[in-house]
Regions:
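Active-site-proximal, Lys/Arg-enriched surface segment
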Residues: 69-137
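Short, basic interhelical loop/turn and adjoining N-cap
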Residues: 56-71
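Short secondary-structure capping/turn segments at boundaries of alpha-helices and beta-strands
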Residues: 36-40, 58-59, 96-97, 110-113
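Short alpha-helical "recognition helix" segments of helix-turn-helix
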Residues: 52
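Single, function-defining residue in the core of a domain
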Residues: 1-46, 55, 65, 86-88, ...
Length: 296
């Protein structure tokens, strides 16, 4: 009985054919090396050039490991290779073929910062698919103190990019934690025609109509009435001194002293359910990070 074995060259050819479709103008030198780097990285579960080189077979096994390692390093430091442009081609191809199986057309988009000790910071926007988080857009910064990683303009650029990936048939719902309390960020998402569900810090000021005093009073969002076992919803709340209008959902606080307080431009009744979906995507991405990107 004959048994067919796929070699590294077979896999590489398959990746090359995909890249030719997704990136018609890819350089030949990149087309020849990228598939093998991808295979080596997967096999080694590492992006360290030496680890990748040790896993490569076929023609690479005829070359000393040091030489293969140097070739991989040259690729990573080559100014003609832009990883952001490369990933842009890949993700646009993927999203163009993406179809939702359920009728509501909701797509949950999560943005967050990831840190690797003191080595680097990544601002990443991901799409939740099942129990996985698929990166759509990201920017990397050295160490964990680079202020560029936290600038509003960077976040707005990433959100605008993600918006451009999807046609109007999809309902994009952006989810963010307490790092992202900017009303300008909310306004930007709203201007693109999408929904935001952002968790608020409890010390943010709001202007709330007090029924007893029969006028608006200034208080922190954490001081808004809430219930232990039921969600509470507020519509048309003025947020911060800019008095930006949002809807607010406060989850049941149960045994915790800090319940979820979600600002949304959508239905507050749906906001908590949507925000809960942030965790499946984020946890997956964090596991990816802690396992060198190879958690599946």
């Amino acid at each position: 009985m004959n048994k067919v074995y796929n070699t590294q060259n077979d896999f590489a050819r398959g990746i090359q054919e995909f890249l030719k479709i997704a990136m018609p103008n890819i350089r030949k030198t990149q087309l020849n090396i990228i598939p093998f780097i991808m295979l080596g990285a997967i096999l080694a579960e590492s992006f360290v050039p030496l680890d990748i080189a040790k896993k490569l077979k076929g023609d690479f096994s005829l070359v000393q490991v040091d030489s293969v390692t140097k070739r991989i390093k040259r690729f990573f430091t080559n100014k003609l290779f832009d990883p952001y442009v490369f990933y842009d081609h890949i993700i646009r191809f993927v999203i163009n073929t993406y179809k939702k199986k359920h009728p509501d057309k909701d797509v949950h988009i999560v943005f967050d910062h990831m840190f690797s000790h003191d080595h680097f910071t990544v601002f990443m926007i991901t799409m939740r698919i099942g129990k996985q988080g698929i990166p759509l857009w990201f920017r990397c910064f050295k160490d964990n103190n680079d202020t560029e990683a936290f600038k509003l303009k960077l976040m707005q650029d990433g959100i605008s990019y993600v918006s451009s990936l999807f046609d109007k048939d999809f309902n994009l719902i952006f989810l963010g934690d307490r790092w992202f309390n900017s009303t300008k960020l909310m306004e930007h998402i709203d201007s693109l025609g999408h929904t935001y569900n952002l968790r608020l810090k409890s010390n943010i000021n709001v202007y709330h109509h007090d029924k007893k005093e029969n006028h608006k009073i200034r208080k922190t969002v954490g001081q808004l009435p809430k219930k232990k076992y039921h969600s509470v919803y507020y519509k048309n709340i003025e947020l911060t001194d800019s008095k930006y209008i949002v809807n607010i959902a406060i989850a049941p606080y149960g045994e915790t002293s800090e319940p979820w307080i979600i600002a949304t431009n959508g239905d507050p009744d749906k906001a908590i359910r949507d925000y809960n979906k942030r965790f499946g995507a984020v946890e997956c991405v964090f596991k990816n990070q802690k396992s060198n990107g190879f958690y599946i």
